[in-house]
């Protein structure tokens, strides 16, 4: 155990967060996301909610300030989003500083970004469209 680091952050996730450089992207996905077929390394965080992990990592993780650092998947035409999901994520991310805007992109554009991500953290999140991409910034 390390002081001030949440026990929700596994050693594997801590290593990945430290190895990421500015501009690298990481996805925190819901339990339904096809993470293992995307290509990047997959970290399992079964049983944890995305919002809890976001709250745990945000004290350690600088979001990009030059490009939109937060991306979520848009609903497929004819489907609906639960606004509570984004609200939970915004609340978790705003504990250290104001939360930047979250942009939405279509499912296939999100999959393309996922294939290029540094890592994908697959969680126990069951919320539909519960995936979020974070772009790492330069640590001050």
UniProtKB/Swiss-Prot annotation:
One of its GO terms (biological process) is fucosylation. It comes from the Bacteria. It catalyses: alpha-L-fucose = beta-L-fucose; beta-D-ribopyranose = beta-D-ribofuranose. The gene is fucU. SUPFAM superfamilies: RbsD-like. Changing residue 111 to F: Reduces binding affinity toward L-fucose. Significantly reduced ribose pyranase activity. InterPro entries: L-fucose_mutarotase, RbsD-like_sf, RbsD/FucU_mutarotase, RbsD_FucU. Substrate binds at residues 30, 73, 111, 129-131. Pathway: Carbohydrate metabolism; L-fucose metabolism. The active site is at residues 22, 64, 111. Belongs to the RbsD / FucU family. FucU mutarotase subfamily. Its EC number is 5.1.3.29, 5.4.99.62. GO terms for cellular component: cytoplasm. Involved in the anomeric conversion of L-fucose. Catalyzes also the interconversion of beta-pyran and beta-furan forms of D-ribose. Keywords: Carbohydrate metabolism, Cytoplasm, Fucose metabolism, Isomerase. This is L-fucose mutarotase. It is found in: Cytoplasm. One of its GO terms (molecular function) is L-fucose mutarotase activity. Changing residue 64 to A: Affects slightly binding affinity toward L-fucose. Significantly reduced ribose pyranase activity. It comes from Escherichia coli (strain K12). It is an enzyme of class 5 (isomerase). Homodecamer.
């Amino acid at each position: 155990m390390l002081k001030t680091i949440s026990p929700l952050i596994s050693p594997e996730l801590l290593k990945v967060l430290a190895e990421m450089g500015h501009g690298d992207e990481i996805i925190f996905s819901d339990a339904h996301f096809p993470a293992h077929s995307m290509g990047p390394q997959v970290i399992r965080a079964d049983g944890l909610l995305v919002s809890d992990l976001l709250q745990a990592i945000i004290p350690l993780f600088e979001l990009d300030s030059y490009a939109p650092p937060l991306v979520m998947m848009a609903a497929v035409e004819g489907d609906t989003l639960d606004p509570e999901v984004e609200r939970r994520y915004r609340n978790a991310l705003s504990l250290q500083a104001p939360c930047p805007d979250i942009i939405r992109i279509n499912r296939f554009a999100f999959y393309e970004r996922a294939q290029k991500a540094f890592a994908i953290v697959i969680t126990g999140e069951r919320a539909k469209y519960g995936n979020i991409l974070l772009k790492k910034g330069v640590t001050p």
